[in-house]
Regions:
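Active-site mouth loops of central-metabolism enzymes
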Residues: 8-24, 73-85, 128-136
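Catalytic beta/alpha-barrel core
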Residues: 16, 37-47, 91, 99-111, ...
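Active-site-adjacent beta->alpha loops and helix N-cap segments on the catalytic face
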Residues: 45-60, 106-120, 135-138, 160-172
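Glycine/small-residue-rich loop that forms an oxyanion/phosphate-binding "nest" at active or ligand-binding sites
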Residues: 67-111, 303-352
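NAD(P)-binding Rossmann-fold cofactor-contacting core
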Residues: 375-396
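Rossmann-like adenosine-cofactor binding region
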Residues: 395-464
Length: 464
C-alpha cells in the first residue's frame, strides 16, 4: 500500500473531540477552509464506533476528504480502555467506513503482527512511536519500528532542549525506504512541525482552527501555510529565527516571513524557545539545520556574546547583541537597538542635554543607555534590580535612581521602557503603578502594541 502515500496531503488536521457532533462540525469547518486531510481520534469519543459512523457520514458528503483513523490505547497515552484486539477491530471498521489510513502505536503493533499484515492489505498503515518524556537516540527507535512492515513510521518525541530538534530531523537523512513522520512535541520542538516535510517527511500535524490540538506544540494549518509559508519553501531554504524566552509573544516571524514572501525568497523565520541555560545547546541546533542568522531578545542579549566569533565595536562596548548572522562559517553579532531608540526620539526631542529616564537593566536597557549618552542626553537609570541598574549607570556615565525616589513631581523629557513588564501574556504588569514621569514615552514592548504604560501615557496626554 506504500504507493498510496504519494497522494497524502502534507498537513493532517488532528481532531480530538469528545462529542461526535462537534467532531463532525469541526471536520466540516476544516474542509470549508480548504483542508482535506483529517485525523479522527476515535479514542477521544465515549464510543469509538460513533466515530466510525461519522467517518462514513462525512465521506458521503465530502468524498474528496482523506481520513486517518486513530484509536490509541490508554496505556500508550490515548483514551481507549479496550484490548488490542478491540482496538484493531475498531480500526478495521474505520477502514470499512472509508478511512484511507490508520495509525497504530508500536506497543499494539508488536503484539499483533499478523493482524497488522492483514490490515495493510486493505489500507495505508502508519506505525507510531511516542515519547512524552524526552528525545532518546532515534536510530534504535526506527530499527524497532522497521521490524514491522508499514507504509509509514511516525516518531514523535518531546523536545526538552533545542538540539532535540536536530536529533529528530536528522533521521530524515537515515535513508529509510519507508516514509517517515518526524515531530518533537512542545514549544521547544516547534521547528520540527514547520521544517519536517521540507526535509522529506510524509506530512505534519496541525490543530483545528477553533479547537485544541491533540499534542503540545501543534498550531493551526492556516498559521503553517500563511505565516510560515509551509508549502512554499524547499529543503534548501535558508532558516532564520528569533531566540528568546518567552518567545510566543514575538511578532518577528510575521514580519520577516512576510518580507521573505514579498521578495520571493526561499527562506523561513522561526521562533526558537531557548532557556537561559540552553544557549550553548541552541548553537548545536543552529549549526546543524543550518540557521543563517537570528534575532536575539530577552533574556539572551548579553550572555550570547560569549558564543560569538566576532562582535562589532559598538555591540562590544554596549555589552549586548540583538542580531546574529553567520559569515564564512563564523557567528557574528551586532546591536541595532541603539539606533532604533535614538532615531525616533530625535524626531520629537533635541537629545543633547535632554533628561531621559531609561527603565530597565538588561540588554535592551544597555543599548538605549549607551546610545542616548553618546547622543548627549543626561541619562538616569532605574530598574527592578537596583544593583544592576547602578552598575549599568556606572559603565555608561548615567545616573542611578531608585524607583521610590521617582514621584509625581519628578519629570523627564523622555522615558524609554526596556523591561518585559506589560508584555503578553502578562499585560497587567507595569513598572510605574500610578504615574508616568515624562513628557515623551518610548515603550520597547510591542506585543501588545498598547501596553498599560502607553494607555496611561495617552490618558495623561503624553507624547507616545
Amino acid at each position: 500500500m506504500g504507493s498510496r502515500n504519494a497522494s497524502l496531503p502534507r498537513i493532517c488536521i488532528a481532531l480530538g473531540l469528545g462529542d461526535v457532533q462537534k467532531l463532525l462540525a469541526h471536520a466540516r469547518q476544516e474542509l470549508l477552509a480548504g483542508e482535506t486531510f483529517l485525523e479522527f481520534r476515535l479514542d477521544y469519543l465515549p464510543s469509538p464506533l460513533d466515530g466510525v459512523r461519522a467517518i462514513a457520514e462525512l465521506l458521503a458528503s465530502h468524498p474528496e476528504c482523506t481520513i486517518l483513523a486513530t484509536c490509541r490505547r490508554h496505556q500508550n497515552h490515548g483514551r481507549f480502555n479496550g484490548s488490542i484486539e478491540e482496538q484493531l477491530r475498531i480500526l478495521d471498521a474505520a477502514v470499512d467506513a472509508g478511512a484511507h489510513a490508520i495509525d497504530v502505536e508500536i506497543e499494539s503493533a508488536e503484539n499483533a503482527k499478523t493482524r497488522m499484515a492483514e490490515l495493510r492489505q486493505n489500507t495505508t498503515v502508519i506505525i507510531s512511536y511516542h515519547n512524552y518524556d524526552g528525545t532518546p537516540a532515534m536510530e534504535p527507535v526506527l530499527r524497532r519500528l522497521a521490524k514491522i512492515p508499514a507504509d509509514g513510521y511516525k516518531l514523535v518525541t518531546t523536545a526538552r532542549k533545542p538540539s532535540d530538534n536536530e536529533k529528530v530531523l536528522a533521521l530524515s537523512k537515515s535513508g529509510s525506504k519507508t516514509p517517515l513522520i518526524l515531530l518533537a512535541m512542545g514549544e521547544i520542538g516547534f521547528s520540527t512541525r514547520v521544517l519536517s516535510v521540507a526535509q522529506g517527511c510524509l506530512y505534519t500535524y496541525a490543530s483545528p482552527h477553533a479547537a485544541e490540538g491533540t499534542a503540545a506544540g501543534q498550531i493551526g494549518a492556516r498559521h503553517l501555510r500563511n505565516l510560515y509559508r509551509f508549502d512554499k519553501f524547499t529543503k534548501a531554504a535558508k532558516v532564520f529565527g528569533v531566540v528568546a524566552d518567552p518567545v510566543r509573544h514575538s511578532i518577528s516571524p510575521a514580519v520577516h516571513n512576510r518580507a521573505f514572501q514579498a521578495r520571493r525568497l526561499d527562506a523561513v523565520y522561526l521562533p526558537f524557545l531557548v532557556a537561559p541555560q540552553q544557549l550553548k545547546d541552541f548553537f548545536a541546533l543552529a549549526n546543524a539545520l543550518p540557521v543563517q542568522g537570528f534575532s536575539v531578545t530577552i533574556p539572551h542579549k548579553q550572555k550570547i556574546l560569549r558564543y560569538l566569533d566576532h562582535v562589532d565595536p559598538l555591540a562590544r562596548r554596549i555589552g549586548a547583541v540583538n542580531t546574529v548572522w553567520k559569515k564564512a562559517g563564523k557567528w557574528r553579532g551586532t546591536n541595532t537597538d541603539a539606533q532604533a531608540v535614538v532615531k525616533p526620539l530625535s524626531k520629537h526631542l533635541r537629545l543633547p542635554k535632554s533628561k531621559v529616564l531609561v527603565v530597565g537593566n538588561g540588554g535592551a536597557a544597555r543599548s538605549a543607555a549607551f546610545a542616548l549618552v553618546d547622543a548627549g542626553a543626561q541619562v538616569s537609570i532605574v530598574g527592578r534590580n537596583p544593583d544592576r541598574a547602578r552598575a549599568l549607570a556606572k559603565v555608561c556615565d548615567g545616573t542611578p535612581l531608585l524607583r521610590e525616589h521617582i514621584t509625581r513631581d519628578t519629570r523627564f523629557d523622555a522615558l524609554v521602557h526596556c523591561t518585559p513588564l506589560g508584555m503578553w501574556p502578562r499585560v497587567d504588569e507595569t513598572f510605574f503603578t500610578d504615574l508616568v514621569p515624562a513628557d515623551i514615552v518610548f515603550d520597547m514592548v510591542y506585543n501588545p502594541l498598547e501596553t498599560l504604560l502607553v494607555q496611561r501615557a495617552k490618558d495623561l496626554k503624553r507624547q507616545i
